[in-house]
Structure formats: structure tokens, C-alpha cells
Amino acid sequence: MRAASLFLLFLPAGLLAQGQYDLDPLPPYPDHVQYTHYSEQIENPDYYDYPEMTPRPPEEQFQFQSQQQVQQEVIPAPTLEPGTVETEPTEPGPLDCREEQYPCTRLYSIHKPCKQCLNEVCFYSLRRVYVVNKEICVRTVCAQEELLRADLCRDKFSKCGVLASSGLCQSVAAACARSCGGC
């Protein structure tokens, strides 16, 4: 077993000594062959020069700007008729959200070292241990989701709403609190 591990340990060094692994490989192409078709462009100084712009006199520049302004189309803003009243939308938008903190419990698993001894020979092994961590979590609550949840709750647990409006909420308070958050 020792001989096999020593053989595997020194195998890369032996292959390197034989020249199978060359540390400085030659480039795949000779340097003089690459980029020969660019030499004319690089040596020509006018290749990269852009034509110079001559500034226009202020009169021409103003005339050009006024022509541009004339060509723009004017779209009037929509106006309401005097008799119509625009109402606010009843559905909340996607931006009606807030962050809400709530207590939460998370379960983590960690590996705890555990010392074990057999006949005066001690070693450590890792034992998986679960840790219960009580934290304050944050969630984003949007008004749209709250309305949908309230609608679902009202449809699914209609007796909670009926009993709450009739004043008999205490008789089913526990069931309604579990299902919909209370009366």
C-alpha cells in the first residue's frame, strides 16, 4: 500500500522529467504570421483620423434649431369635461407594499465535534446537531395580497364574518383566529 501511494505521489514529477509536460509551450502560430493584414492600416496615419467639423455661424445654427422646433408635433394633454369626476381606483397598485416583522423559528443543523476514546486512543468525529433559533423575520406585505387573502378568507370561512357582524364572535373566535387572523 505504501509503495503504491509513493508511486502515485512521484508520478507527475517523473512525467515532467520525461518532457511530456512542458512548462513553456511555444505559441501555436509564429509571431510574424499573425496580424500581417493589419500592418498597412497601422502604418497609415490617415486611417484613424476623422474629418474635422467646422463650427457653423450662430445665424445658421439658430436657423437649424428653429427648423427642428417647427417640425415637432404638438400633442395636447387630455382634459376632463366639466361634468365628469375622476374617481380613485379601488384596487391597490403593486407599489402599496410595506415590510412587516414577525417572530419566526428556524431550524439549523450544525456539525459539532464529539470526542471518542477507545483503549486510550482518542479521536474526534463530527455529529450533526439541530439548533432551534428564534428570530425576527421580515416579509413584504402588499395591499393587493391582503385584499385577496381577505376575499379568500371570507369565501372559505363565511361563518366568521357572519358571526363577527352579529356580535357572536367569541363563540368561534379560536377557529376564526387560526384560519383568518381573528374577528
From Swiss-Prot:
Disulfide bonds join 153-183, 160-176, 169-180. The modification Sulfotyrosine is found at residues 47-48, 50. There is a cross-link at residue 20 (Isoglutamyl lysine isopeptide (Gln-Lys) (interchain with K-?)). Residues 1-17 form the signal peptide. PANTHER family: MICROFIBRILLAR-ASSOCIATED PROTEIN 2. Belongs to the MFAP family. This is Microfibrillar-associated protein 2.
